[in-house]
Amino acid sequence: MKVLIAGDSWGCGCWDKIGNTHRGLELFLQMKGHIVTNLSVCGYSNTEIYRSLKTVDLSEFDYVFAFYTNPFRDIISDNLYSKYFDVPDYTITYKDVLKMYDELWCNSYLMFDSLNYPIHMIGGHHKLEEIESTKNLISFIPSIREMFYKDYVQPKIVYISTVFKNYLKKFDRDTIDFLYETYNVYLNLQNIQQEYFYPDGYHLNAKGHLILSGRIEEFMK
């Protein structure tokens, strides 16, 4: 099969001891005889993942898989929501965060759907919302963490340091507490995810990528 993978660091693979990635997912699929093109880049936002997919002819591939990342990354990549972050003395509330989140994930699905080709979505850094209303998006794995840990429920809104850390003074206290609470949920998972996840508690290790590649290969049979 000709397989296309797009995403952020979750699509790249897992880290070795010196900080490089071995691109495990594509490697394991190649070992099974598949021809794999991997467009994933660490730190990519959903918009950047979408743009990477636009650089290739999707019809040349039998299957296209895209890792869905934290929608708040688009605040940085496209300088969105300056009305909240750049206005002096404006305090961002939890209501604002919810509004931004709903707009961001909805817009990202519309982007991916506009490619007019079946995209098998994988919830990596962020869990997928319902996508039944789209024409071309398939919810292949809504949440990798929930796939490995059946008792775990991934939070809807997740603190992401590259976005929120530089803007903490803009949030009210209740919103800051909420964001850190979701972050602590991730940190607490580090103690139980060691079998399949890298020590950072976020990314799959080689064993996790091997299982994920097996799930993908089984689906493509």
Task: Please name every model-derived segment.
Residues K54-A206, L210, G214-K221:
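Alpha-helical cap/lid subdomain in secreted, periplasmic
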Residues M1-T47, I211:
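Serine-esterase "nucleophile elbow" of acetyl-processing enzymes
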Residues T47-T55:
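Metal-dependent catalytic neighborhoods of phosphoester/phosphodiester hydrolases
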